[in-house]
């Protein structure tokens, strides 16, 4: 029993330390395990940010424009010429900056269940405190890029009730004999935006430009539950290496590891619940870059070469821009691997089937809270044989605890004899001190996976359960579930054998309080899962202990 408690305490201590370290990092404090990265004020050059390869646009003609915030160089036309064109669809409200035809603001109006106004979230924004935008331009010469002021082509800016698509077009000034017409196509009910770049050669010589498509974001954190940490930063997906996450810290240290050339896949910016991604046409060769362009500003993008365009001719480059919630089924239908932006970490292989099952249950009951309850019940049923073995072992250990204490008292001055006597007792009573521990350890990956499923699923956002729980992604407003969690843990402690060590006994009594403090700040959906799991565990343990006790009494009577 002491061995089991030791293992459980190690698990508890490591979990507490990891949760605290995640809380430190999510609140901008240095990690306890990784050195703090000192940011420099040196703007990135035109390399791709992959220190290993060093392959990128070495020629000045192919260098990406250095202006990071969209502000024009001093030699260009005054900034007052740029305008913000407001638009609206059934899922978006946004603004396109005519400087570069940049998608500078994008508010998702139907995130979550779309019923509450406070569920709207602004994904792209361009203010003094926060920058996150999507932009495109041309490389390969003095061609139009995101620093040039475009002219809006006259047309509607709102999706009418009888329309399925809305198109917004912008024309660039002629530069280097080239004019660009950029068209955004919004489709009803879709978080995928079509972006078409038409390149017209109005000069007298052939041109060979490249189109760049990038996402620019600062490293400011998004709101996440306290004591939890979710990934924030760029990601690259290709057939070669599949899903590659890149931390801002790795970019700072020039240690970003990702595929730099491909003809498939996508690039993205990922945050809790939401993501954006450029998805170029499959089969089109492109270079991928991830780099730092300001002390706190980063970009991830692709550069796609265009075949030579003769004078008087034009070429079209089409791509898709996803900007929306990380809903797995929707993401799977947009592009291969895009569902991976919903980050489950190292437990993905278990978490994905669990979410699939949770989703199926939700489809049956129509409520995410009850789906969590039923999934927890189902998991407990599947693991009942393991739990039964654990509780039986605990019950047997509880029976021989007085004899163990007597042996400890008898041989307290001779640890070697005490251990030998304990081993003999285990052998005689056919008790395995690891018997109660191993079944619990086997179940831990599943419980951790379900934790990440509930933490990462945007479906919980704005999803009610019953009575006072109106949003499973937010903490319990009246702390009823955390209190129930503490009570259930206290009851479990009482059902377990009392540790022989008084200090250890006090620590076991302190555990419900320590965990409750953390659970006061956890999302209600997570706490609901743990409360239901604890209640079912108590019922299982009580039933098994009572059954064994009855069997032992009958055996003794006979």
Swiss-Prot record:
Keywords: Cell inner membrane, Cell membrane, Chaperone, Membrane, Protein transport, Transmembrane, Transmembrane helix, Transport
Superkingdom of this protein's organism: Bacteria
Topology within the bilayer: Multi-pass membrane protein
Keyword Cell membrane: yes
GO term, biological process aspect, one: protein insertion into membrane
Pfam family, one: 60KD_IMP
Signal peptide range in chain numbering: none
Chain ranges passing through the membrane: 3-23, 364-384, 438-458, 477-497, 508-528
GO cellular component terms attached to this protein's record: plasma membrane
InterPro entries for the chain: Membr_insert_YidC (IPR019998), Membr_insert_YidC_N (IPR028053), YidC/ALB3/OXA1/COX18 (IPR001708), YidC/Oxa/ALB_C (IPR028055), YidC_ALB_C (IPR047196), YidC_periplasmic_sf (IPR038221)
Presence of the UniProt keyword Cell membrane in the record: yes
Molecular functions (GO terms): membrane insertase activity
Entries under PANTHER family matching the protein: CYTOCHROME C OXIDASE ASSEMBLY PROTEIN COX18, MITOCHONDRIAL, OXA1
HAMAP family on file: YidC_type1
Function description: Required for the insertion and/or proper folding and/or complex formation of integral membrane proteins into the membrane. Involved in integration of membrane proteins that insert both dependently and independently of the Sec translocase complex, as well as at least some lipoproteins. Aids folding of multispanning membrane proteins.
Protein name, UniProt field: Membrane protein insertase YidC
Organism the protein comes from: Burkholderia mallei (strain ATCC 23344)
